Amino acid sequence: EIKETFKYINTVVSCLVFVLGIIGNSTLLRIIYKNKCMRNGPNILIASLALGDLLHIIIDIPISVYKLLAEDWPFGVEMCKLVPFIQKASVGITVLSLCALSIDRYRAVASWSRIKGIGVPKWTAVEIVLIWVISVVLAVPEAIAFDMITMEYRGKDLRICLLHPTQKTSFMMFYKQAKDWWLFSFYFCLPLAITALFYTLMTCEMLRKKSGMQIALNDHLKQRREVAKTVFCLVLVFALCWLPLHLSRILKLTIYDQKDPNRCELLSFFLVMDYIGINMASLNSCINPIALYLVSKRFQNCFKSCLCCWCQSKDLLSLEERQSCLKFKANDHGYDNFRSSNKYSSS
């Protein structure tokens, strides 16, 4: 009964995520690609994050919806391995991009001079390549572990794609047993811990700045604080979306006992939590553009301009957006002049 109920709920949520995710993430990528003033380090990382979400939405969600509604798996063993592989790679891209964004915000405050110059795009490109390579490598065990089995159900032989109960190597058996703890520690706790660490360091660094420098760089600091607030919002959204799923899996590992006479009620509770967690985690693929629209004024202006004038020329940029870009560049130039005149003034 629980499975039958959530089958339709999950289908509706998946269709909603599919539509909103394609519109939101493709619009976000177009904004960063078309507008030169939006092509900075943090925004390129956000674009990488959006691209990872878009791949997951286009490939995984339609197949997952079919899997919910149909009993049999008709796509073959290749797709059985590809779907969980892309899903884990997409989550890995999200996690590592959020870590890189948090570190980037601290470095922006601690070392102003590294923001400008040709080194920034090169370092950002290296970061993105590393993020994608590491995410793909860490997702390989999923492709190995998942396989198809045939089982009898209601007088029919059904082909099912799942994490195979028996693995061929000792490493894969260990991965199967430790999978939930590994996912919880790396794909959930790591970005939260890194964000907490570097945002604490960033706060200490900003409090340590001299009051005169704070006044001179008032507009520049406002720009940095807005980006920091945006990154923090993305991490918070990630945590809220993925917490229910990880919580249900960890509780099942720690509380569930096969000898417990009430285990059926407990399993039903965990099944409900699992379905809710899957829906919440799925929302994370489409909610980042919405969060950026609500938190960042610059992204809000760009979204409005892009959605209203999707087919128009890239020259039709809103006046407020252009002023924002010019103001940001002027602040950078003003800070360089201030910094060069005070380079040797501190003891």
Curated annotation (Swiss-Prot):
Keyword hit for Endoplasmic reticulum: no
Cited SMART domains: 7TM_GPCR_Srsx
Keyword Transmembrane on entry: yes
InterPro entries with a match to the protein in the record: Endthln_rcpt (IPR000499), ETB_rcpt (IPR001112), GPCR_endothelin_rcpt (IPR051193), GPCR_Rhodpsn (IPR000276), GPCR_Rhodpsn_7TM (IPR017452)
Segments in the Cytoplasmic topological domain: 33-43, 104-124, 203-230, 296-347
GO-annotated cellular components: plasma membrane
Cystine connections: 80-161
Ranges annotated as spanning the membrane: 8-32, 44-69, 82-103, 125-149, 178-202, 231-256, 269-295
SUPFAM superfamilies, per database record: Family A G protein-coupled receptor-like (SSF81321)
CDD domains (alphabetical): 7tmA_ET-BR
Topology term for the membrane: Multi-pass membrane protein
Molecular function (Gene Ontology), one example: endothelin receptor activity
Superkingdom as given in the UniProt entry: Eukaryota
Lipid attachment, kind S-palmitoyl cysteine: 309, 311
Subcellular location per the Swiss-Prot or TrEMBL entry: Cell membrane
Extracellular compartment segments: 1-7, 70-81, 150-177, 257-268
Keyword annotations from UniProtKB, A to Z: Cell membrane, Disulfide bond, G-protein coupled receptor, Lipoprotein, Membrane, Palmitate, Receptor, Transducer, Transmembrane, Transmembrane helix
GO BP annotation list: developmental pigmentation; enteric nervous system development; regulation of blood pressure; vasoconstriction
Gene3D superfamilies cross-referenced by the UniProt entry: Rhodopsin 7-helix transmembrane proteins
Family: Belongs to the G-protein coupled receptor 1 family. Endothelin receptor subfamily. EDNRB sub-subfamily.
Job description of the protein: Non-specific receptor for endothelin 1, 2, and 3. Mediates its action by association with G proteins that activate a phosphatidylinositol-calcium second messenger system.
Designated name of the protein: Endothelin receptor type B
Annotated organism of origin: Coturnix japonica
Gene this chain is encoded by: EDNRB
